[in-house]
Amino acid sequence: MSIQSSCVRLDEGRWNPKNREVLEKLIEKYRDTNSYAVFDWDNTSIQGDTQLNLFIYQIENLVYKLNPQKFNEVIRKNVPTNNFKERYKNLDGEVLNAAKLANDIHKDYIFLYENYIFDKKLSLKEIRNTEEFKDFRAKMHYFHNALPGNFRSELACLWEFYLLIGMTKNEVKSLAKESNDVKLGEAIGNVIVESSRVLTGEAGIVRGIYDNGLRIRPEMANLYHELKRYGIDVYIISASMQELIEVFATDKSYGYNLDTENIYAMKLKSTTDNILLDEYNYDIPFTQREGKSETINRFIRPKYDGRGPILVAGDAVGDESMLTEFKDTEVLLIMKREGKLDNLVNDKRTLIQYRNLKTGLLDPK
């Protein structure tokens, strides 16, 4: 039976049966009509956050190409020095600020740079057992969590990206592949780390928390394959970095097999040698919140006679604009997370797809 005459059939997988049926009918309706669908990546196309997990991987393995002076500049860049909100305290109940954390992190980094990053005087196992590493790890995670809770989201994103400067784009892609492969094999869930009780520094003792681990979502990969199979183009718009999403979305080892030219994500400026700089490339929108809709309007809609996407999928407030912006959008696929996008649950276009928090797999309920 030819594709033209066959019925659309998504793999059953762990889809909610109603969601699967609606998606199949949508593909059937718009097959070969020069239509397109747009998806978020982190916690939508996959379980977990690929940018966050690279941040975690960098810390765990001390993969930086920054000398202490440049590292010190980067972690302070554009970050206000006023005290954080009341809830951001150390274990002694003292409210913290960026300057105190950065001072401690910088001191730790000097030791780590001299003994491992620049000169392998110690093994990775040995350096991880030092008080400096314990302090660095916890305070980096604490700082990372405090930024979006106290300042604009754009600043928090760029702070994370800038830790990759000094690397070429290909080096970042290689690092992303390493990180993905390791994190796909680790347990998912929150990890709590405590800073050194010996090297308390200016910030004192803090606890950092992070959401570790990644999982592939075969149901989403299959959905992308079927959309493409029936002539519906698939686009990714992500608030992670372009190089990271390209690796995960296009490398055949992960099974999504998407097209590089259909990926729109965050980009830093770079030198003529493709070395990343600590400056955002505003030639494209900041692909978060309204920037996702702007990306569709500027770069995607013109290819389709000004029509919006027939299907948009996301999981959080950063996706809300592109989920609600376009009158042509017939289905909103929400990969539901607790407390996220509750305002769209009752939209008649919405499909709610739950996940199992322990396994990261889709939940068919």
What are these regions (language model features)?
Residues 2-41, 47-95, 108, 133, ...:
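Non-catalytic pre-domain segments flanking phosphatase-related domains
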